[in-house]
């Protein structure tokens, strides 16, 4: 079998001659491959044995030999690329092709559905791995979506209309202002085999009391089998949605004893985790799922950090049969990138500094400094939601004279954060301000556990927005620390549905604590033979409802 090295050398010859027959000499070919005449003769013999080309040598000084290509170099390159992809070896793939843009297209062309022994498989390309899939811990946008595929909660939130629906509980009722009752389905099983018990539900809900949004849960009991009572310390009109939010997923009560649970979680959802490594997340349809069995048998999400700068964070690449990926769906996100000025900073605690930064670092100014690659995906934001226009259009103010150094903090494994921070640095440098870029892990960022003048942040909201917007921001310790406010008054108003969210958000923008930057276009790319794909506000879709039309694609 020809070696990969020989394949690569043939591809270089084929590219040099553009696949056309040529009259040439050993020396000319040796120059192309940067080797000796003796070695090129050996290579040509091996390529000829492999059936890739025909070499008709002519002897005599000045005579030129005939080179005919029998194999298409592009096809051979695609074959080698697929071998490297199967090995998750993108680094060698980049070396093979020599251009990351080309590699990106090649990779996307290989992400296709496959039918193995009657199984319907979907492959997805993503820019980073998912080491933490534990509900109740700090989760990023994509992890929140995946948690919903692996776990269930008492209720679930309809992604389209934002209404609470039956999930583990088939009915529920509010018995009093502080007492709710949920009626659970029988015969529900976890992925590792055992049946769901009421003790699992009680342990999961009591575990949540350490989280700010769930701190008002006073106790959880089961008066009779398959009935759960939740008692609150204060009324919460949002409880039926709160119990269906990503943090409130039900775990087996022994979850802490299960090996590597955060990476290999066990739930009751439509998909179970089979493998979760630095290269790939593999989830398989759970045949004992209590609801409709998923139509896609297996989903493999490949992680390609080597191509991170060529993959937009909010574009999800599904299977595709060509390099020209069809856009299955696209939308502007509910949420945005924004800057948070830190109340703990002696510099950004000052109104004049915050106001100057907001006048300088406008969305339009940042877009003018970014690559066209990102301009296509970013839209100026003037409020946390697309329909809000809270940022005031003010002329650029004079820099406070004592400001010469600033620090911005962002979380790692997010190349668009890195890109935005580089733009911020370039703009501030022109103003005579040195910007230090501090990159931390996600937990440190989420909790605001480091010193910084301001932070680069993002928030993605889901339906209903009047629930998720405050819930998402309130459960982010970083926001409270930057505002210097524990929001205890606001959360009580919100639970009673008496808080005007738009007025509250406008206030923190007006005071220049929060500065909106960009809304992001979310996009799904793949074959149109895929059905049942409805993009949610996180840019993903419900795997269990998707299917392939075998007569198309």
Curated annotation (Swiss-Prot):
Keywords: Activator, DNA-binding, Repressor, Transcription, Transcription regulation
One GO process term, biological-process aspect: negative regulation of DNA-templated transcription
DNA-binding region(s), chain positions: 26-49
Region named Solute-binding: 163-494
Domain of life of the organism encoding this protein: Bacteria
Task performed by this protein: Activates the small RNA gene sgrS under glucose-phosphate stress conditions as well as yfdZ. Represses its own transcription under both stress and non-stress conditions. Might act as a sensor of the intracellular accumulation of phosphoglucose by binding these molecules in its C-terminal solute-binding domain.
Protein name, per record: HTH-type transcriptional regulator SgrR
Biological classification of the source: Bacteria, Pseudomonadati, Pseudomonadota, Gammaproteobacteria, Enterobacterales
